[in-house]
Curated annotation (Swiss-Prot):
Its cofactor is Zn(2+). The keyword Chaperone does not apply. It comes from Clostridium beijerinckii (strain ATCC 51743 / NCIMB 8052) (Clostridium acetobutylicum). Binds 1 zinc ion per subunit. This is Large ribosomal subunit protein bL31. It comes from the Bacteria. The gene is rpmE. PROSITE patterns: RIBOSOMAL_L31 (PS01143). PANTHER family: 50S RIBOSOMAL PROTEIN L31, CHLOROPLASTIC, LARGE RIBOSOMAL SUBUNIT PROTEIN BL31C. SUPFAM superfamilies: L28p-like.
Amino acid sequence: MREGIHPEYHHNTVVKCACGNTFTTGSVKEELKVEICSKCHPFFTGKQKIVDVGGRVDKFNKRFNIGSK
């Protein structure tokens, strides 16, 4: 491998979220800023919004007259 072509790896990179949560990880950057993390993401907080997929299927069937036979 060639010397001097790889970026310097930082073992204690601080990750800052928009919600105020901070944690450390490894990266080639010294600091990372993210908009969403596991502390504020709806999937991890349990505050998920259920999407009504059934309504979309009914709309499709109605549009193409499927199931009315």
